Amino acid sequence: MTLGIIEVDKKGAITRNGLLRGVIEKNGKVLSSDKELIGIIHDNGNIFSVKNGMTGIVQENGNIFSTKYGHIGQLKENGTIYSIKKGQVGLYKGNLRKVGGFLLLFFDQF
């Protein structure tokens, strides 16, 4: 599965391959493109989904852990996103912590 290019602009708008997928607000709330609250990303890296509770954590070193599946991937400094099972799955431009949280919510919600 290739996620394509995911971008988060300075206002927090999240796009994938040019299509608006949601927004990350300054308080860490993640809203879908129709403004429905789908989750929250805390400053400590914990990620919570409205539907499923805590879905994971993004560590400072870029490791992505899912509460359901354990260590699922890595965010590299160059923005490359790797899945342990599938290899390179995408490219990210922007804040890695934010997109890490969004990606876990993305797998869970979209």
Question: Residues of each region from the PLM?
Answer:
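Extended, low-complexity, charged alpha-helical tracts
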Residues: 49-50
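Long terminal segments
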Residues: 1-21, 26-28, 36, 44, ...
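Catalytic zinc-binding patch centered on the HExxH motif and its immediate surroundings
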Residues: 39
